[in-house]
A protein has these predicted regions:
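Boundary regions of SH3-family modules and the immediately adjacent low-complexity/disordered segments
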Residues: 1-3, 7-9, 14-67
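Surface-exposed interaction/gating patches
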Residues: 25, 83-86, 117
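Short peripheral tails and domain-boundary helices/loops at the edges of structured domains
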Residues: 42-59, 144-171
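Active-site nucleophilic cysteine motif
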Residues: 61, 73-92
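Surface-exposed patches in mature extracellular/periplasmic domains of secreted proteins
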Residues: 69-73, 98-99
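...with weaker cross-activation on analogous glycine-rich loops/strands in unrelated enzymes
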Residues: 94-160
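Low-complexity, Gly/Ser/Thr/Pro-rich intrinsically disordered linker/tail segments
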Residues: 162-188
């Protein structure tokens, strides 16, 4: 989230906020501030050109650790599992649907796994889908997701997440990996 200012000066009162991945049009520049089409000023360090974005999807998602879980939320005030994925991908210039079931068929390519739960092909940054849920696989067998269990974005041991999902008769439905071609298909 970033503050909006009525003038290009951090010592002036704020005029509101914008959320991460908000699309804005820069119409003027003054020092380290950019005026956006609404007339407000935003510090330039809080803006990323859509043409370049960020390739660090995991890094973007990690910034949300501790943000409250809010079903349907899509800001630092609260996120759900699919909006966490949608925001992280949007910052990389990749547009995906809002809901996890639609993301499952739209994100990257499927990573093969056998019925016995062989996850040897999984890598950091892969998207792991369950019925109605999605998160990011991290290094050291950790799983990053917005969840109603902790009521926040948190890291869990991947084995613990698998055990909990199996106890609810809801195992992994697929693992998806973003390809380099998906990363290069930017927003318009």
């Amino acid at each position: 989230r970033s503050h909006l200012y009525a003038e290009p000066d951090v010592k002036r009162p704020t005029a509101g906020t914008i959320s991460i991945s908000a699309r804005v049009k820069v119409v003027d520049v003054s020092g380290s501030f950019c005026r956006i089409a609404t007339g407000h000023w935003v510090h330039s360090r809080h803006l990323i050109c859509l043409e370049y974005g960020t390739q660090d999807i995991v890094g973007t998602a990690i910034k949300f650790i501790g943000v409250p879980y809010l079903w349907g939320g899509r800001s630092a005030e609260g996120v759900d599992c699919s909006s966490l994925v949608q925001i992280a991908l949007a910052m990389a210039g990749v547009s995906v649907p809002r809901d996890s079931d639609l993301q499952e068929s739209a994100v990257g390519v499927e990573v093969p796994m056998d019925d016995g739960g062989d996850y040897s092909r999984i890598k950091e940054g892969d998207f792991v889908f369950f019925p109605g849920h999605v998160g990011l696989f991290m290094d050291d067998w950790r799983f990053l997701h917005a969840n109603a269990f902790d009521m926040q974005v948190s890291l869990h041991g991947f084995s613990d997440v698998l055990d909990r999902s199996r106890s609810e008769n809801a195992g992994v439905t697929s693992i998806r990996r973003l390809t380099s071609s998906a990363r290069s298909s930017r927003h318009d």
